[in-house]
């Protein structure tokens, strides 16, 4: 089939999005996180089993070598999200996607510009930073210096935040217990590639995300 295939996703409290895969003949079903931040497939298995591993097989199942994510923020709705192999679902985005070239193929990594808090430049990424869109990360991770400023701004006045694409407080603050809210930003400095942002589910919920393997591009459009 050279068209596309749609996988329904389950939203687990806005922290993870799961879907089913089938392995073997007849297929045995497993529930997995479709993780764009990992090159490894992890599934439960029996110990000391005989198996044959195929590590470099290309089937060209789909005409377009791309896949796209839509993650639903509303945990009360039956439809938790959607992963489309080989195409896009126009029901889940508005307007055109903005595409950026992949700069490091081990991850879906790309360059980003300055980081703004409200309408003020932090200057932190003015010379340029790197980021990658990671469907397997719940939060939005970034360097400690700038994330500290962001979390301080959230606590002070909860202004609208912009990180190249705008995020509102409703999008980056997570629900905890009845009287508790959790910041969707977490600090991370361990990188050999310079300042790095991981744009996890907090970012991918408001922005429909396309991973174009054929052209080595990542695209974002407003989710619908």
From Swiss-Prot:
GO molecular function term, any single one: aspartic-type endopeptidase activity
Subunit composition and interactions: Heterodimer of a light chain and a heavy chain. An intermediate form is produced first, and undergoes proteolytic processing to remove the internal plant-specific insert (PSI) and the propeptide.
Distribution of this protein across tissues and organs: Pistils.
UniProt pH dependence: Optimim pH is 4.3. Active from pH 3 to 6.5.
Record text on activity regulation: Inhibited by pepstatin.
Cystines in this chain: 125-129
Phylogenetic classification of the source organism: Eukaryota, Viridiplantae, Streptophyta, Embryophyta, Tracheophyta
PROSITE patterns: PEPTIDASE_A1
Entry similarity comment: Belongs to the peptidase A1 family.
Gene3D superfamilies for the chain: Acid Proteases
PTM comment: N-glycosylated.
Taxonomic superkingdom: Eukaryota
Protein name (Swiss-Prot/TrEMBL): Cardosin-E
Organism: Cynara cardunculus
Compartments where located: Microsome membrane; Protein storage vacuole; Secreted, Cell wall; Secreted, Extracellular space, Extracellular matrix
Catalytic residues (positions): 35, 134
